[in-house]
Structures are given as structure tokens and as C-alpha cells.
């Protein structure tokens, strides 16, 4: 796991714990983080934050752009992220926070990648198998990627199950090279 992913998980968990311990709505935190990420997506703001002359004035501008929709805890988060030069991670932090909330609420997000569109019967079998595996509510997203040639890739949390033809061919190629 990369250090950025570790950092994101730590920040997300800290936000989650802050919300719970201060009796704050998780939905309010989702809204605040989404607002912050949306503001950061503005090219002018992004350029200001990424420049070497990033200052307290830029932090104040960023907070002002939140239009009083961010509480004191959110403002403190902005200051901490800015102090640690991590404001650019806000969009990823927002996504990580949502994943963490869903995980604590017993929801697992799963991505199933196939080379072609799957029929309803096959999708039903995959859903049943995944529900048995996780014993939780699951949200399954199906993605088509023709480059995998055939088979499936299943992604959830930090786990990837790669049962694609493409990966098998790569393994075979590596074996043959030695």
C-alpha cells in the first residue's frame, strides 16, 4: 500500500472519529469534504495552492470560498492539510472518507471488470457469490475493459482478484522468459 493511501486512510479515519466523538453528522462531513474538493478543482485555486508562494492568505481565501458551509472542525482540517502540504489530496480524501463510512455501515463497494457485457444470469451468480463472501450489503459496479481479453477482475477495498486472460498470458510469458 502506498504512503499516500496510508495517509488518506489516516486522515479519513481521523475525520470519522472526530465526527462520531463530537456527535456530528457523517453526511455533513461528506458535504463539507465534497465542497472543499469542488473548490480545489477550480484551476485558479489549484494553481495558487500548488505554487511555492502558497501562504496564509491562500488558506484564508480557501476558507472564505467555503461560504460558511464548513464548521470549525472543517476549517481546522483545511489548516492541518495546508500546514502539511496535503490540500491537493482533498478529492481523494473525500472518496476515502465515503469508503470508510460505507465500510463502517456494513457496505462493501465492489468493482467487477469484464472484457464484454455480462448477461443477467451471470451477474446474478456473481452477486450471490459476493454476498456469501462478505455477509454485508454490497454495491457492485460492472465495468467493461476489452484489454483483459476474457475472465474477470474483482476489486474491493485494497484487494484485487485478477482472473483475467490477460493476466494469465502475462504470467505464462514471464515463466517462458526464465
From Swiss-Prot:
A Pfam short name: OSCP
Domain of life where this protein originates: Bacteria
Protein's cellular compartments: Cell membrane
SUPFAM superfamilies assigned: N-terminal domain of the delta subunit of the F1F0-ATP synthase
Signal peptide: none
Membrane topology classification: Peripheral membrane protein
Record's keyword terms, sorted: ATP synthesis, Cell membrane, CF(1), Hydrogen ion transport, Ion transport, Membrane, Transport
Molecular-function GO terms, alphabetical: proton-transporting ATP synthase activity, rotational mechanism
CC terms in the record's Gene Ontology section: plasma membrane; proton-transporting ATP synthase complex
InterPro entries xref list: ATP_synth_OSCP/delta_N_sf, ATPase_OSCP/dsu
Assembly with partners or alone: F-type ATPases have 2 components, F(1) - the catalytic core - and F(0) - the membrane proton channel. F(1) has five subunits: alpha(3), beta(3), gamma(1), delta(1), epsilon(1). F(0) has three main subunits: a(1), b(2) and c(10-14). The alpha and beta chains form an alternating ring which encloses part of the gamma chain. F(1) is attached to F(0) by a central stalk formed by the gamma and epsilon chains, while a peripheral stalk is formed by the delta and b chains.
Family: Belongs to the ATPase delta chain family.
Biological role: F(1)F(0) ATP synthase produces ATP from ADP in the presence of a proton or sodium gradient. F-type ATPases consist of two structural domains, F(1) containing the extramembraneous catalytic core and F(0) containing the membrane proton channel, linked together by a central stalk and a peripheral stalk. During catalysis, ATP synthesis in the catalytic domain of F(1) is coupled via a rotary mechanism of the central stalk subunits to proton translocation.
Protein name: ATP synthase subunit delta
Classification of source organism: Bacteria, Pseudomonadati, Pseudomonadota, Gammaproteobacteria, Enterobacterales
Gene name, Swiss-Prot/TrEMBL: atpH
